[in-house]
Design a protein with these regions (language model features):
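Extended alpha-helical targeting/anchoring segments
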Residues: 1-414
């Protein structure tokens, strides 16, 4: 089982998480960088690390060691056998985690870092050494054109079909996504540096996992746990940022109804694994502005039952209602029918787990999957009875805009 190092402190007055990442990734191991920006300020903690073993979700849970990685949306079919899996698409791994041989936790409030895993003196020496250059080794060609799947017409037709299912009583909401694929010359590191500038978010992550990379700026917690306390943050309701955005959201019957529906779904998910009477709302219907959109945000909290593990909590809430719909199982069945391709990492979870201490999982949205020189993007919109097909398509494009801007910026640097 995992036993954390005795507290080993490293001064960070001349060291950033990105600088630490550049040093730790040099030996070719799988590596990760997790940061957070909330309301324009750097979050309290950042995590940087690397490991030589890359495993799937079941192996990550069983190993009893610190792990960082992703669990794809399509894992839902294992949890709910009634949900069919559509065509495979690109054949991406359903899950991929690195077991951390080296793990450093930055505490930006105290201006220090702790070596949680790894030989402390060796890690400290490595972090104190010269910083490798993040620049690419040689000039490369720029990326290619963006291919969108489905087309606008096909997506809007799927929205019409989803509304028919809703009118027939099959579901209250169905989250339909659209994809974009774009060849790119930018590296995962270059994409991350650009994305954290373009779209700073509560969950910033760079995962380089044995030939596959995820670069993301997710605004939304899937679920997190510290000890026996659990929480999740439903986000639903979207408008363009700027003057009057909060009033537009709070005054929109559609956005409020969509949000309330998903808050109720989140409360139900937590109630499956929390002590009776402990699930409550800590925040409710609060407008929050991000770089390219403004959302309504709530927070649901609860206390876990004594026999529930952090991974049990993750399964109980997976996938998030904000990327599936309500009721969740029927919505996922309809997503498989209407989208026709597996989602891969999109709509799943990116997470770290410290056994016996904490788990923090965000929803894998606002995420670039870099696979063999192709950037894969995806975004969705919650379809309800009064949805406008063209408006839902445009909402997806707004959500993709930050990712596409980050790619262009990274390619300009390359």
């Amino acid at each position: 089982m995992f036993a954390m190092n005795a507290l080993t402190v490293v001064s960070t007055d001349l060291l950033t998480p990105l600088g630490a990442y550049l040093r730790l990734r040099e030996d070719g191991r799988a590596s990760f960088l997790l940061e957070s920006v909330e309301k324009g300020r750097l979050g309290r903690h950042s995590f940087v690390g690397a490991g030589s073993r890359v495993v799937n979700f079941a192996e990550a849970e069983a190993c009893g060691l610190p792990v960082v990685g992703y669990l794809g949306y399509d894992h839902a079919a294992r949890l709910e056998p009634k949900v069919p899996l559509p065509e495979d698409g690109r054949g991406l791994p359903e899950s991929r985690f690195v077991i951390a041989d080296t793990l450093v936790r930055f505490d930006h409030g105290l201006g220090m870092a702790e070596v949680l895993c790894g030989q402390p003196s060796a890690v400290s020496d490595l972090l104190a050494g010269p910083q490798p250059s993040p620049a690419p080794a040689e000039p490369r060609a720029k990326g290619g054109a963006t291919r969108r799947l489905p087309s606008r017409h096909e997506y809007e037709r799927a929205v019409v079909r989803a509304k028919e299912h809703i009118r027939n009583g099959d579901a209250f909401q169905i989250v339909l996504s659209q994809r974009a694929e774009r060849p790119t010359s930018a590296s995962a590191l270059e994409l991350y540096r650009s994305l954290r500038r373009v779209n700073p978010s509560p969950y910033l992550f760079l995962l380089e996992l044995d030939g596959l990379a995820l670069v993301g700026s997710s605004p939304e917690t899937l679920v997190k746990a510290g000890g026996r306390q659990a929480s999740l943050n439903p986000i639903a309701g979207t408008t363009r940022p700027g003057e009057g955005d909060a009033e537009r959201l709070l005054g929109s019957e559609k956005d409020r109804a969509e949000h309330v529906m998903l808050v109720d779904l989140g409360r139900n998910d937590l109630s499956r694994v929390c002590r009776p009477g402990t699930v409550r709302l800590a925040r409710y219907l609060e407008p929050e502005r991000f770089s390219h959109v403004t959302h309504l945000v709530s927070e649901v909290v609860g206390e876990l039952e004594a026999d529930v593990s952090h991974f049990d909590l993750l399964r109980a809430c997976f996938p998030a209602g904000t990327v599936s719909g309500a009721p969740k199982v029927r919505a996922m069945q309809l997503i498989s029918e209407l989208e026709r391709y597996r989602r891969g990492p999109y709509g799943g979870a990116v997470l770290y787990a410290l056994p016996g201490e904490a788990l923090d999982a965000c929803i894998a949205i606002r995420t670039i999957v870099l696979d063999d020189g192709v950037a894969l993007l995806q975004a969705g919109a919650g379809i309800v009875a009064d949805s406008n097909p063209a408006a839902e398509h445009d909402e997806c494009l707004r959500k993709l805009a930050a990712l596409e801007t980050a790619i262009e910026l990274a390619e300009a640097r390359a």
